[in-house]
Curated annotation (Swiss-Prot):
Coiled coil: none annotated. PSII is composed of 1 copy each of membrane proteins PsbA, PsbB, PsbC, PsbD, PsbE, PsbF, PsbH, PsbI, PsbJ, PsbK, PsbL, PsbM, PsbT, PsbX, PsbY, PsbZ, Psb30/Ycf12, peripheral proteins of the oxygen-evolving complex and a large number of cofactors. It forms dimeric complexes. GO terms for biological process: photosynthesis. A core subunit of photosystem II (PSII), probably helps stabilize the reaction center. Disulfide bonds: none annotated. Keywords: Chloroplast, Membrane, Photosynthesis, Photosystem II, Plastid, Thylakoid, Transmembrane, Transmembrane helix. InterPro entries: PSII_Ycf12_core-subunit (IPR010284). NCBIfam families: PRK13686.1. This is Photosystem II reaction center protein Psb30. It is a single-pass membrane protein. It is found in: Plastid, Chloroplast thylakoid membrane. HAMAP family: PSII_Psb30_Ycf12.
Length: 34
C-alpha cells in the first residue's frame, strides 16, 4: 500500500523549501528594479 499522507508531507516540505528561496529572490529583484 502507498502511504499518501507521507508522500503528501514530503511534497509539501519540498515545495516549501523551493518556494522560500524563490520568493526571497523575487522580492530582491522587485526591490532592485524600483
Amino acid at each position: 500500500m502507498i502511504n499518501w499522507q507521507v508522500i503528501g508531507q514530503l511534497i509539501a516540505t519540498g515545495a516549501i523549501m523551493l518556494a522560500g528561496p524563490a520568493v526571497i529572490v523575487l522580492l530582491a529583484l522587485k526591490k532592485g528594479n524600483l
